[in-house]
From Swiss-Prot:
Annotated source species: Hepatitis B virus genotype F2 subtype adw4q (isolate Senegal/9203) (HBV-F)
Taxonomic lineage: Viruses, Riboviria, Pararnavirae, Artverviricota, Revtraviricetes
GO molecular function: DNA binding; RNA binding; structural molecule activity
N-terminal signal peptide: 1-19
Family membership noted in the UniProt record: Belongs to the orthohepadnavirus precore antigen family.
Annotated spans, Disordered: 165-212
Listed name of the protein: External core antigen
Region of interest (3 X 8 AA repeats of S-P-R-R-R-R-S-Q), residue spans: 184-206
């Protein structure tokens, strides 16, 4: 039973269609990345500090406020909605498991170690997953991927050769050099005005029938 719960914890780090296979992948050494199908990777998140991601409670409140109808809908919306649903369910399972461990382990030190590991390590993975999918739904997947790459390049650049401020996701589309969304409107050169003829034109007299 404990091995089953351990597999549940590990599977929560992959809330996609591959989640059911992750426990087997862990046993047989399969390389399964929960972000791969979305164009990202776990390595891209290694550049972001743990305190960068909001708390699980704040992320759940954001998901509920913005996408509750879509998350509760029985219809398929987008892969990000599906992954977000699974991440929320996995967090609920983790909290249930943490309560079970707290009620069944008699050794307080061992209980604290398990609960702390769940909150620190698995909690961080859940926060990363929630943040990624909520951001993809809010800003667009391409913008989020561009932000992760831009931040990785910025943090790896020596301070003397990089801008003082790190990229910000909410302002990324306005500050990036290469814009992927739309094109700037083409400026039209003014056409030369036509020269009016010097001869005066006769004004046509309008008949009463033609007036509206």
């Amino acid at each position: 039973m404990q091995l089953f719960h351990l597999c549940l914890i590990i599977s929560c780090s992959c809330p996609t269609v591959q989640a059911s296979k992750l426990c087997l992948g862990w046993l047989w050494g399969m390389d399964i990345d929960p972000y791969k199908e979305f164009g990202a990777s776990v390595e891209l998140f290694s550049f972001l500090a743990s305190d960068f991601f909001p708390s699980v409670r704040d992320l759940l409140d954001t998901a509920s406020a913005l996408y509750r109808d879509a998350l509760e809908s029985p219809e398929h919306c987008t892969p990000n909605h599906t992954a977000l649903r699974q991440a929320i369910l996995c967090w609920g399972e983790l909290m249930t498991l943490a309560s079970w461990v707290g009620n069944n382990l008699e050794d307080p030190a061992a209980r604290d170690l398990v609960v702390n590991y769940v909150n620190t390590n698995m909690g961080l993975k859940i926060r990363q997953l929630l943040w990624f999918h909520i951001s993809c739904l809010t800003f667009g997947r391409e913008t989020v991927l561009e932000y992760l790459v831009s931040f990785g390049v910025w943090i790896r650049t020596p301070p003397a050769y990089r801008p003082p401020n790190a990229p910000i996701l909410s302002t990324l589309p306005e500050t990036t050099v290469v814009r992927r969304r739309g094109r700037s409107p083409r400026r039209r050169t003014p056409s030369p005005r036509r020269r009016r003829s010097q001869s005066p034109r006769r004004r046509r007299s309008q008949s009463p029938a033609s007036q509206c």
